[in-house]
């Protein structure tokens, strides 16, 4: 097996089966959370559901049906709701950033400090392994915080959303140097490569075309516990060329 090039545009790709677990607000789905530097896109493969969001313009619900493409930008608190066997392909900007902490769940304020957030967000059970019970527990905590944020918004208190954003920024600030390196090595490098190719073509230099190749990654065999559901993350190390 040979390492393959990164995905086009340095995006991340995952197959997502949205959690079927019931929530306290009579829905089924995962943990509401927000990305601070990455846009995210859902390509709906099968099933039926909704994307519930809250941003600086207020709460919104977007239907999810097979064939739909829905995307949202940093600052969008979001959760996927599973109405019927919802499966999507997730396209994530800046591959590697969500794994490096660019995702903050909407826990109540007392769990949004650097001291309290890690334990609340942890998936590890008593045996030290990722646990579905822990995934449900942190989901329930995030839903409680999200429900309160929506309630505050509808009461006219816009500052609750802003306070969450400020707390999220404080949580991720120690990681920003790592994020910058990831973007420099990924999306920015990909953009520079494209610009070099364009510059070469202006001078009739098309030698990069002789480096053309085809890569393939099979469906990952193992699922992991994500924020929104069961994930199968496609990683370049698992591909062939």
Regions found by a protein language model. Give the residues of each.
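An accessory alpha-helical subdomain
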Residues: 126-205
């Amino acid at each position: 097996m040979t390492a393959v090039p990164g995905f086009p545009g340095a995006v991340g790709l995952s197959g997502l089966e949205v959690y079927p677990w019931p929530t306290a607000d009579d829905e089924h789905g995962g943990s509401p959370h927000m990305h601070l530097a990455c846009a995210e896109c859902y390509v709906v493969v099968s099933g039926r559901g909704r994307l519930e969001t809250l941003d600086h313009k207020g709460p919104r619900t977007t239907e999810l049906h097979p064939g739909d493409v829905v995307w949202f930008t940093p600052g969008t608190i979001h959760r996927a709701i599973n109405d019927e066997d919802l499966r999507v392909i997730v396209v994530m900007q800046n591959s590697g950033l969500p794994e490096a902490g660019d995702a903050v769940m909407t826990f109540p304020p007392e769990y949004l400090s650097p001291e309290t957030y890690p334990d609340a967000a942890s998936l590890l059970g008593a045996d030290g392994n990722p646990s579905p019970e822990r995934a449900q527990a942190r989901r329930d905590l995030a839903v409680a915080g999200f429900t309160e944020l929506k309630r505050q918004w509808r009461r006219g208190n816009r500052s609750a959303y802003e306070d969450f954003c400020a707390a999220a920024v404080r949580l991720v600030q120690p990681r920003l140097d790592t994020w910058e390196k990831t973007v420099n090595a990924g999306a920015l490098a990909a953009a520079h490569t494209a610009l070099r190719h364009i510059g070469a073509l202006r001078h009739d230099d098309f030698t990069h075309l002789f480096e053309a190749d085809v890569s393939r990654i099979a469906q990952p065999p193992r699922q992991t516990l994500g924020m929104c559901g069961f994930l199968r993350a496609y990683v370049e190390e698992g591909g062939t060329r």
